[in-house]
């Protein structure tokens, strides 16, 4: 479930592994990652697709931890190697021949998908929480485009779940394997 959520949100591993319930708004379907856990040290709002909300509701129902959304079996933030080990154990192929997929590689997949499907560069870059390197541009472009990104993230979720138009390009990871994580 943690891996599927990571893929659906195009988030970094550390952001998802340390995710807490107080960051989640299930009514407005937004996850706000605090600045201290973000690479760019700025809070990041993530619009949540219907499938991402389903995962969170399932986690809440399990009530494995009062604070952490995806706790380890010991009740702490999972190790940074947990997703890497899972992908290796499942032998999930990378787009690079002979290599195993990485958690971070799903962010690249999202970026490619967004470009190939005609989404504005700004939407994809904001979804990935990338900063604008041009200082002048950054000064004038302060919005996170949250509402504009909602449709893109819902379309990404349909693609990831195999309901998109381009299903022949979807690499299958069994739902059982995803749930085991």
Show the residue positions of the predicted features:
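Hydrophobic/aromatic ligand-binding patch that stacks against planar heteroaromatic rings
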Residues: 5, 15, 113
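The alpha-helix within a helix-turn-helix
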Residues: 6, 17, 125
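Residue-level marker of regulatory loop/turn positions in helix-turn-helix DNA-binding domains and
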Residues: 5, 103, 145
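C-terminal secondary-structure termini that scaffold catalytic or DNA-interacting sites
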Residues: 38-40, 50-54, 58-66, 71-77, ...
């Amino acid at each position: 479930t943690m891996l599927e959520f990571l893929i659906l949100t195009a988030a970094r591993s550390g952001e998802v592994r340390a995710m807490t319930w107080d960051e989640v708004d299930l009514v407005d379907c937004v996850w706000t990652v605090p600045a201290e856990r973000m690479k760019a040290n700025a809070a990041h709002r993530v619009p949540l697709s219907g499938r991402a909300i389903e995962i969170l509701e399932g986690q809440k129902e399990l009530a494995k931890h009062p604070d952490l959304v995806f706790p380890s079996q010991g009740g702490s933030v999972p190790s940074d190697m947990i997703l890497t080990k899972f992908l290796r154990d499942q032998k999930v192929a990378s787009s690079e021949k002979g290599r195993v997929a990485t958690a971070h590689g799903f962010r690249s997949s999202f970026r490619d998908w967004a470009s190939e499907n005609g989404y504005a560069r700004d939407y994809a870059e904001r979804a990935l929480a990338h900063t604008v390197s041009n200082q002048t541009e950054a000064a004038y472009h302060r919005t996170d485009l949250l509402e504009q990104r909602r449709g893109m993230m819902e379309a990404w979720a349909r693609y990831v779940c195999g309901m998109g138009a381009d299903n022949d390009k979807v690499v299958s990871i069994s739902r059982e394997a995803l749930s085991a994580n």
